[in-house]
């Protein structure tokens, strides 16, 4: 079983691990990577602040954070009692410099803002989005014109 950069969208990794174990034949292998603790710190900081802003907080009253991004230690704890014969979990720093502001804005627009934009009514979407972009660029833009964001990965290899 293989997955690349998708499983942070799956919130119940306990169930994921149990189903993976069930699906694998004896000696079968699961290999995946997904976002881990510390991923996109700038963006998530901006968003946590923005959804608490008095102008927008009513739209996020029932909002559930859409990602599961554990630390290596947290994931090791999750896998401990699943029954796998081998478990290897590593963390990777995959920090990224976007070539320019436009490249970062494209990343903000798709996929990063999608779960938030679904909560905001049409009449304030543009204002909300523009404020997020402006704050992100104020924090991420480097003197050379690139834009920096933290990216942290969890790499998992499981053998049944």
Segments (PLM) and residue ranges:
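A short glycine-rich, Lys/Arg-flanked "PGG" loop and its adjoining helix->strand segment in the class I
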Residues: 14-29
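A conserved pocket-lining segment of Rossmann-fold NAD(P)-dependent short-chain dehydrogenase/reductase
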Residues: 56-63
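Conserved class I S-adenosyl-L-methionine
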Residues: 29-55
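A short His-aromatic
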Residues: 8-10
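Conserved Class I S-adenosyl-L-methionine
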Residues: 63-160
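A conserved beta-strand element that flanks and buttresses the S-adenosyl-L-methionine
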Residues: 2
């Amino acid at each position: 079983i293989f997955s690349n950069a998708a499983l942070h969208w799956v919130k119940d990794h306990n169930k994921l691990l149990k189903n993976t174990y069930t699906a694998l034949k004896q000696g079968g292998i699961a290999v995946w990577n997904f976002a881990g603790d510390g991923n996109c710190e700038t963006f998530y900081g901006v968003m946590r602040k923005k959804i608490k802003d008095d102008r927008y907080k009513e739209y996020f009253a029932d909002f559930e954070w859409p990602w599961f991004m554990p630390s290596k230690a947290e994931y090791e704890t999750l896998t401990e009692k699943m029954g796998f014969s081998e478990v290897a979990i590593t963390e990777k720093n995959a920090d990224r410099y976007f070539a320019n502001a436009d490249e970062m804005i494209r990343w903000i627009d798709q996929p990063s803002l999608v779960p938030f934009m679904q909560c905001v009514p049409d009449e304030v979407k543009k204002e909300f989005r523009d404020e997020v972009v402006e704050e992100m660029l104020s924090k991420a833009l480097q003197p050379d014109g690139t834009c920096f964001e933290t990216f942290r990965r969890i790499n998992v290899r499981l053998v049944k």
